[in-house]
């Protein structure tokens, strides 16, 4: 992610939450617009039960005399990532607020990002960062266990999107094959005409 682009769309699947948050926070502070999709597929190192206990401990933290005064505990995976990123930038300053304006986070892959090229961040990928065999937790599963209600809805929409995506890819593949065949035949006919002009 060193090159500056108009908007970078990151596929969150298989990335470690904290590592991705640190990289994204640096990029948005530098002026890069970033969109993170499939936040429910983000990973946290450590087994599920341990992470659930940690989250319940975090849920206990509240203003003693009035819980409505915060701190507010987000349950949705996209908001968990958002809060992790927010904690890594000076969000109370004008510069930090402007940086957060450049960030968008989503569960699933909503339009128009389903038609955009998605990238991964190798420095934050679980398979490259955690030792093989280490336990990890999916943020979607953790969120669902602590009160997020839309896991089934997101799963249904994702299945629908994957079917449409597979159909689109098959059509594109067939069209590319046809185009390449047409180009090859045109090149052959042009070569034949030139040879005929020289009497071959």
UniProtKB/Swiss-Prot annotation:
Keywords: Cytoplasm, Ribonucleoprotein, Ribosomal protein. One of its GO terms (biological process) is translation. SUPFAM superfamilies: Ribosomal protein L13 (SSF52161). It is found in: Cytoplasm. One of its GO terms (cellular component) is ribosome. Belongs to the universal ribosomal protein uL13 family. Component of the large ribosomal subunit. Mature ribosomes consist of a small (40S) and a large (60S) subunit. The 40S subunit contains about 32 different proteins and 1 molecule of RNA (18S). The 60S subunit contains 45 different proteins and 3 molecules of RNA (25S, 5.8S and 5S). NCBIfam families: L13_A_E. PANTHER family: LARGE RIBOSOMAL SUBUNIT PROTEIN UL13, RIBOSOMAL PROTEIN L13. This is Large ribosomal subunit protein uL13. It comes from Candida albicans (strain SC5314 / ATCC MYA-2876).
């Amino acid at each position: 992610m060193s090159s500056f682009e108009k908007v970078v769309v990151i596929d969150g699947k298989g990335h470690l939450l904290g590592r991705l948050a640190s990289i994204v926070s640096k990029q948005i502070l530098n002026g890069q617009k970033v969109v993170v999709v499939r936040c429910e597929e983000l990973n946290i190192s450590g087994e599920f039960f341990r992470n659930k206990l940690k989250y319940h401990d975090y849920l206990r933290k509240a203003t003693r005399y009035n819980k409505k005064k915060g701190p507010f505990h987000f349950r949705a995976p996209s908001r968990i990532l958002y809060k992790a990123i927010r904690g890594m930038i000076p969000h109370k300053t004008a510069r930090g607020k402007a940086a957060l304006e450049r960030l968008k986070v989503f569960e699933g892959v909503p339009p128009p990002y389903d038609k955009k090229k998605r990238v991964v961040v190798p420095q934050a990928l679980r398979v490259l960062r955690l030792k093989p065999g280490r336990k990890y937790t999916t943020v979607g599963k953790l969120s669902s266990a602590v009160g997020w209600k839309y896991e089934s809805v997101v799963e249904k929409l994702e299945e629908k999107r994957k079917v449409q995506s597979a159909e689109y890819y098959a059509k594109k593949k067939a069209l590319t094959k046809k185009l390449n065949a047409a180009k090859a035949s045109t090149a052959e006919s042009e070569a034949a005409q030139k040879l005929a002009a020289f009497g071959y």
